[in-house]
Amino acid sequence: MDKRIAIVTGANRGIGTEVVRQLAEKKWKVILTARDEAQGRKACEDLAGRGLDVQFHRLDVTDPENIHRLAQDLKADPGRLDVLVNNAGVLMDEDRGSDRITIETLRRTMEANFFGPFQLSQALLPLLNRSDDARIVNVSSGLGQLSDGGGGYPAYSISKAALNMMTVQLAEDLKGRVKVNSVCPGWVRTEMGGPGATRSVEKGAESIVWLATDPMIPNGKFIRDRKEIAW
Ligand SMILES: NC(=O)c1ccc[n+]([C@@H]2O[C@H](COP(=O)([O-])OP(=O)(O)OC[C@H]3O[C@@H](n4cnc5c(N)ncnc54)[C@H](OP(=O)(O)O)[C@@H]3O)[C@@H](O)[C@H]2O)c1
């Protein structure tokens, strides 16, 4: 059987790098993307040095030109994708409530956490359509839950709630072709989560990798620890 092929955004560090590692350990071919070329190549070389099938491609998810170029390059080689992991994300709220958050912060957060994943998903659909088991995994957050969202990070929460609605819309419109789910990794010790977070990156990546690889996953759900949670 052909190797399964995944692409992961924001994979030069944190949960993204770990998702690439876990997928590649399962003998997948993984395209590791990052907006910083040097950091992305370094992460890729570290994994490839362990014998893993990992390739680098530069991608700033907020740059439409980058997205177009990536889609063109992947169309030429490898010509198909099985899984897109929309992992790249920013948290820039700086302790401001929704009464004081600047529109600039809101816009920049939406660009990275919502418009980027949206445009990238659309651009890579032709390649996902060539898979017999295509999936999009949107790395969201409990802070984006409408049912439990008040956590003091308004721009971030709004962007992840929008990402979740993107999951719902795409899951419906692509039914039978691509499974689309949101996932909360939990509170993870990364640059974003900070050193006091309760989870390792290995644990944070677990449900993301499960949604990418398990034969029996749902469609159009919000998942944490392999279980459905409320929107
Ligand atoms: N850590 C947690 O507790 C936690 C909890 C819930 C959800 N999440 C979500 O999990 C995902 C991964 O977060 P993390 O904890 O691994 O955070 P992280 O260590 O801060 O990593 C974020 C990654 O996203 C990349 N990124 C940001 N903007 C980008 C852009 N425009 N284009 C491409 N890449 C971009 C960063 O690249 P640079 O290095 O260039 O900045 C970095 O590689 C995010 O979507 C986050 O919202 C994390």
Predicted regions and their residues:
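The beta1-alpha1 cofactor-binding region of Rossmann-like NAD(H)/NADP(H)-dependent oxidoreductases
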Residues: E37-A38, R58-Q72
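Rossmann-fold scaffold of SDR-type NAD(P)-dependent oxidoreductases
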Residues: T9, L81-G89, N113, N138, ...
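C-terminal helical subdomain
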Residues: K175-G176, S182-V188, G194-W231
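Conserved glycine-rich Rossmann-like NAD(P)H-binding loop of the short-chain dehydrogenase/reductase
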Residues: K26-K42
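A glycine-rich helix->loop->beta "capping" turn
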Residues: R50-D53, D73-N86, M92-E94, K179
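Canonical Rossmann dinucleotide-binding motif of NAD(H)/NADP(H)-dependent dehydrogenases/reductases
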Residues: M1-I31
